[in-house]
From Swiss-Prot:
Residue ranges occupied by any CS domain in the UniProt entry: 225-314
Gene: chordc1
Binding annotation for Zn(2+) 1: C5, C10, C24, H64
Binding site for Zn(2+) 3: C155, C160, C174, H214
Function: Regulates centrosome duplication.
Full protein name: Cysteine and histidine-rich domain-containing protein 1
Pfam families with a match to the protein in the record: CHORD, CS
Domain annotation CHORD: ranges: 5-64, 155-214
Entry's Gene Ontology BP terms: centrosome duplication; regulation of centrosome duplication
Length: 341
């Protein structure tokens, strides 16, 4: 009878009588997720794609393990205080933002746009140099681009642990997860079947919920539009917007604007794209504004046209007239006409 191996990175079934000392290739370490990179603590290979992470070959050989690891016990948190006894540490104050000065005439948002001057920091130049493909990576990409599928190639479908063993593998039914992996508050599960667990090995060994064909090659998704965390602060003469996009590509990124509108287009980490258009709260001088591109973020330094404090970064859209008030006015006019008749 075949048994399931619970070594990390294996997930294969094995015969207990044929379990030799080097039958299993696995990871003795733990999974590491940091700054969008995924890998194992026992080896140095890192990737941003979850399917590639699951297909990273083990770095240690040993016998298969049939013992399922115990799930971690969550500590029970008790409190002796009632909710009503908890008081806020600080008094609450409501601060009203200053209103824009009425004397300033706002330029038209349809003014011509100009590209803001950009400066590339030494840290970004150094980071981009490190990210250049080595000869080994270039060879791997060339192999992936070829039509030939090599023996031992892992299926790229999520949750499938099968490898290519010949033409017969194409006729097999692939059991995989059509959704995406979700890690939230210590729980791990696939969005397509919602079977939650706190143990990473149990998550990896969950059988797929969808039947289909094996996917031996990674699909080319092209550039992916993603959100970026950003914030802003101001001085007496400048507004500084910080966009936290790592390793941006200067040749493919630009920021353009006029006196009241800013258009941001950034390509970072090779294949990620961030776009945003902001209708600014105040007025700027684009000719004296600039973009500082660094390894960990991008700073857009906007020169204020007037030395005044901005209540917020963006200008709220003008609210359209309420339709209900218009309907009431029409109804009142109709009632007056009826009374005259």
């Amino acid at each position: 009878m075949s048994l399931m191996c619970y070594n990390k990175g294996c997930g294969q079934r094995f015969d207990l009588e044929k379990n030799s000392d080097d039958a299993c290739t696995y990871h003795p370490g733990v999974p590491v997720f940091h700054d969008a990179l995924k890998g194992w603590s026992c080896c140095k290979r890192r990737t941003t794609d979850f399917s590639d992470f699951l297909s990273i070959a083990g770095c240690t050989k040993g016998p298969h393990n049939q013992e399922k690891p115990a799930e971690p016990v969550k500590p029970e948190v008790k409190s002796s205080l009632d909710k009503n006894d908890v008081k806020p540490k600080y008094d609450e104050f409501i601060i009203q933002a200053p209103k824009p000065l009425e004397s300033i005439q706002r330029p038209s948002p349809d003014e011509p746009f100009s590209i803001l001057q950009s400066k590339i920091s030494p840290s970004l130049k150094q980071a981009l140099e490190k990210l250049k493909l080595t000869e080994e990576n270039a060879h791997e990409i060339k192999e992936e681009d070829s039509d030939e599928i090599k023996i031992g190639t892992s299926c790229k479908n999520g949750g499938c642990c099968k490898t290519f063993a010949g033409q017969a593998s194409d006729d097999e039914t692939c059991l995989y997860h059509a959704g995406v992996p979700i890690f939230h508050e210590g729980m791990k599960y696939w969005s397509c079947c919602k079977r939650k667990t706190s143990d990473f090995n149990t998550f990896l060994s969950q059988e797929g919920c969808t039947r289909g064909k094996h996917q031996w090659k990674k699909k080319d998704a092209g550039k992916k539009v993603v959100p970026c965390r950003f914030d802003w602060h101001q001085t007496g003469s400048q507004v500084i917007i910080s966009i936290y996009a790592k390793n941006s590509v200067p040749e493919l990124s630009l920021v353009e604007g006029n006196s009241t509108v800013l258009k941001i287009h950034i390509i970072f980490e090779g294949e990620k794209e961030f776009e945003k258009q902001i209708s600014l709260w105040g007025v700027i001088d684009p000719s004296k504004s600039l973009v500082n591109m660094m390894a960990t973020k991008i700073e857009i330094v906007l020169k204020k046209a007037e030395p005044m404090s901005w209540a917020r970064l963006d200008l709220p859209p003008v609210a359209p007239p309420k339709e209900k008030e218009k309907e009431k006015d029409v109804d009142s006019e109709d009632e007056c006409d009826d009374d005259e008749d």
